[in-house]
């Protein structure tokens, strides 16, 4: 029987181990524990619980996207609300592995524009937001021009290599 406390204890016990992310296999084998992991990733608990929980979600969705599909709306809502950059990064990656849903579509689109355009946001988060924008362009080709105008502004400034690579990938339609 799983509860939030037992899952939190499991994460904390394994947090410092070199193969921490191998813990994702436990959740693949015990999907009844997933709601607690999702809740912990979106919680206000102290570090490292939310960040490490969200990090495990990345490994779970890459191994078996269907396991997290039922939580997509909850994860999207959590992404839109969290200020934790580590959790944001992981949730952006998780949602890239799932199909775009109608609920929160507009909010997610606006969020990704804000994250991508904000120079104070962590570079990885900006790149993953850009990858979401690339997906949105398929449904909304008119946003491509807006994305490209942000890119033009960014290219006139000093840029981290990871952001440059993300932009190059975006432009490779």
Language-model features: where?
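Alpha-helical scaffold domains
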Residues: 1-173
């Amino acid at each position: 029987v799983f509860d939030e406390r037992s899952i939190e204890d499991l994460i904390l016990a394994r947090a410092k181990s070199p193969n921490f992310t191998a813990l994702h296999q436990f959740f693949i084998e015990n999907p009844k524990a997933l709601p607690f992991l999702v809740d912990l990733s979106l919680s206000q608990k102290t570090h490292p619980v939310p960040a490490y929980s969200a990090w495990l979600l990345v490994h779970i969705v890459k191994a078996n996207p269907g396991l997290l599909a039922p939580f997509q709306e909850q994860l999207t809502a959590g992404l839109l609300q969290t200020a934790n950059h580590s959790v944001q990064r992981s949730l952006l990656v998780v949602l890239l592995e799932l199909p775009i849903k109608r609920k929160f579509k507009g909010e997610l689109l606006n969020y990704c524009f804000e994250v991508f355009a904000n120079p104070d946001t962590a570079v990885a988060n900006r790149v993953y937001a850009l990858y979401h924008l690339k997906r949105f362009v398929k449904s909304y080709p008119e946003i491509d021009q807006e994305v490209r105008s942000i890119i033009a502004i960014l290219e006139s400034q000093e840029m981290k290599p990871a952001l440059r690579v993300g932009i190059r990938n975006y432009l490779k339609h």
